[in-house]
């Protein structure tokens, strides 16, 4: 997922045919209470806003900050530029928050970090601010708010932009081989991919039916989640307020076996799936005309339809397939904004959060950076819809996206899942053994945090 963040600005300079992103730091008294809503002239002070991303994203954030400072002449927002690497961004924030530093005051977080940040007490609850300002939360994706931003009945963050896994397909090849629509089930995908792969290899021996992320890293967990939940499985469940892992459920083992079969039995996915396939190798293979189907994030749409893309105008996008009797599942991704518990100017930080989440700024992210806004109402904006031909379909995917476990030990849990799922893909151990071992280690991990 790191590459995804780096390219997010280029992202949908087509995924919906558009482009995106933001920044802010310190000032008054540390308190969780909310004072009266400041006016444009009364608001004073400085805050630090930490954000990473591609160069064009950082430049856009500078523009957002300039507009905020123009609205509030007595305010200064310092942009603290983070690395493009997602994990490095997390570690930088963790170090600052563990040290109870007021720098940064406000920052973006990958949705997968929320469990750790909330459980560690690093985020300022936003409920009092929302209530005081009568702030309308209904404009956001409610599933995202409830599954990711709220915990224990309290609100800790707001979505800036949304991501979810998608199926890309070659419209021209489906038509060439007699298919009128993309696959709805995984078995349909296998059958279609095999037929297209067989035919295309007569002239292109490097052609593959289906490419996806199988290397040992975070996006492998995202892919695994999609197979698991589209088969009625789950990674875990909450019982009596405690998360209980369910990694070796029969549905999960069946899903992992299918992933293995894509490479070794059906042979529609390349052998290097589990050694090299991350977002960019997957995207490039599809974009160079060497694959019929691709699992990737929304950012790939714009790149597939760039002027120099060999597949420009030939690509369709659809929800990911599912197993019989179940529904499509897409892993929830994206970035959320929150306020540090240790900020010296929480009131100013909250005003900045509201500004970033305002209709005009969110629309700007969509129009200029190609981001998928956290606000639902922006998806109905005529200008955004005009620039985003697939926005309506993507919106439905986002509304039903599945989050990874929102638990404080998610980074360690992810490493466990990555390790054993990848070992199964490589043929080192069976899917059953892989998930049995993952289950045992996950149970031990949970005990450490009990």
Swiss-Prot record:
The keyword Transferase does not apply. It holds the Pfam family SBP_bac_1. GO terms for molecular function: maltose binding. InterPro entries: SBP (IPR006059). It is a lipid-anchor. It is found in: Cell membrane. GO terms for biological process: maltodextrin transmembrane transport; maltose transport. SUPFAM superfamilies: Periplasmic binding protein-like II (SSF53850). One of its GO terms (cellular component) is ATP-binding cassette (ABC) transporter complex, substrate-binding subunit-containing. CDD domains: PBP2_TMBP. Alpha,alpha-trehalose binds at residues 57, 84, 89, 110, 161, 163, 217, 279, 297, 299, 334-335, 371, 404. Keywords: Cell membrane, Glycoprotein, Lipoprotein, Membrane, Signal, Sugar transport, Transport. The complex is composed of two ATP-binding proteins (MalK), two transmembrane proteins (MalG and MalF) and a solute-binding protein (MalE). Part of the ABC transporter complex MalEFGK involved in trehalose/maltose import. Binds maltose and trehalose. This is Trehalose/maltose-binding protein MalE. The gene is malE.
């Amino acid at each position: 997922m790191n590459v995804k963040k780096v390219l997010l600005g280029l992202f949908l300079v087509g995924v919906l045919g558009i482009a995106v992103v933001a920044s802010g730091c310190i000032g008054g008294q540390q308190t969780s209470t909310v004072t009266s809503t400041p006016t444009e002239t009364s608001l004073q002070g400085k805050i630090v806003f930490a954000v990473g991303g591609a160069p064009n994203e950082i430049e856009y954030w500078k523009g957002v900050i300039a507009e905020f400072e123009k609205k509030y002449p007595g305010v200064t927002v310092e942009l603290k530029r983070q690395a493009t690497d997602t994990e490095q961004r997390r570690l930088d924030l963790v170090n600052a928050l563990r040290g109870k530093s007021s720098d940064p005051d406000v920052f973006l977080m990958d949705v997968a970090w929320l469990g750790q940040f909330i459980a560690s007490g690093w985020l300022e609850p936003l409920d009092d601010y929302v209530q005081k300002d009568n702030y309308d939360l209904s404009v956001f994706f409610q599933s995202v708010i409830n599954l990711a931003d709220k915990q224990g009945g309290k609100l800790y963050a707001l979505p800036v932009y949304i991501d979810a896994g998608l199926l890309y397909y070659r419209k021209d090849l489906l038509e060439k081989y007699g298919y009128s629509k993309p696959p709805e089930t995984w078995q349909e995908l296998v059958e279609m991919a095999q037929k297209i792969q067989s035919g295309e290899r007569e002239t292109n021996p490097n052609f593959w039916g289906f490419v996806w992320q199988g290397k040992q890293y975070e996006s492998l967990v995202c892919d695994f989640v999609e197979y698991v939940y589209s088969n009625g499985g789950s990674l875990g469940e909450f019982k009596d307020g405690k998360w209980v892992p369910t990694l070796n459920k029969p549905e999960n083992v069946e899903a992992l076996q299918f992933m293995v079969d894509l490479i070794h039995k059906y042979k529609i996915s390349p052998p290097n799936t589990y050694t090299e396939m991350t977002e960019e190798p997957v995207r490039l293979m599809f974009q160079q005309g060497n694959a019929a189907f691709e699992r990737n994030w929304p950012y790939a749409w714009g790149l597939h339809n760039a002027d120099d893309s060999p597949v420009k105008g030939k690509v369709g996008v659809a929800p990911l397939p599912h197993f019989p009797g179940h529904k499509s599942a897409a892993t929830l991704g994206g970035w959320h904004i929150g306020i540090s518990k240790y900020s010296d100017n929480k009131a100013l930080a909250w005003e900045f959060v509201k500004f970033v989440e305002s209709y005009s700024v969110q629309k700007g992210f969509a129009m200029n950076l190609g981001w998928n806004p956290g606000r639902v109402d922006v998806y109905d904006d005529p200008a955004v819809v005009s620039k985003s031909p697939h926005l309506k379909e993507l919106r439905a995917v986002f509304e039903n996206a599945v989050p990874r476990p929102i638990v404080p030990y998610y980074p360690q849990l992810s490493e466990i899942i990555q390790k054993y799922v990848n070992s199964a893909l490589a043929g080192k151990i069976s899917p059953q053994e892989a998930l049995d071992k993952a289950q045992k280690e996950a149970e031990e991990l949970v005990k450490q945090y009990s």
